[in-house]
């Protein structure tokens, strides 16, 4: 069993190292900032990787459901190998997605330095919005794997409770179960109890329990690392989203200023027209007053001999 665990962990470590090398090589590949076709091609590549991750998640769910009906240690071992393979594959896929998102972010940053494509431009808003959309999908994926990890841990806890009752005839309290799981002593305790009670015929059951324990712990470690990668990507995409929100906020403020300026200009024109109208009226009134004053004087002057 120890050989199996060591072998599985070594494969996982080797793959993790290879992924890191792949990441370094991928980061050396530049994405043409001005080429939208290449940008959207990269986006489609990320979506394909996401689709593959969804399929692996479905396989892990199916394997977890299958584990509930398997009670033979050899069958559990075979199932564990499948799940190990799926988890290492999903880790590699997700790290590839992370590398591509970094490339997209660098491409967007370079694009903002191009004349006419700076922050707030339609091209920049489109690019930022696309990356932000990928981030929302990544968050959903992260939540899916987090729920799967929680579900597996809960179901394993229930398995330990059932086995404890089978061996001792007593229902384990919360503290006992947590101690058995956290310390890894559940299998040792069950083995001791079985031997003391002379239940040699159920040793295969013990092997099955140990396989389940090893599977859950190994998968949980891998899923925790996967969760951390998701968190790293979420931080990257959140920065893009905040930038988009800032751009949209500034555009909204600019639009508000323009509208306010337009309203003020319209008001000024109306005021100007009103001033002209009143000036004309005042002029006419002044002329009328002058005529009214001068007419009698002129009339009397004309009537004098």
From Swiss-Prot:
Q: How does it sit in the bilayer?
A: Single-pass type IV membrane protein
Pfam families noted in UniProt: SNARE, Syntaxin
In which tissues or organs does this protein occur? Answer: Expressed in tips of root hairs.
- GO MF terms held by the record: SNAP receptor activity
Spell out the family assignment given in the record's similarity comment: Belongs to the syntaxin family.
Please name the PANTHER family in this protein's record: SYNTAXIN, SYNTAXIN-123
- Name recorded for this polypeptide: Syntaxin-123
This chain's source organism reads Arabidopsis thaliana
Q: What is the lineage of its organism?
A: Eukaryota, Viridiplantae, Streptophyta, Embryophyta, Tracheophyta
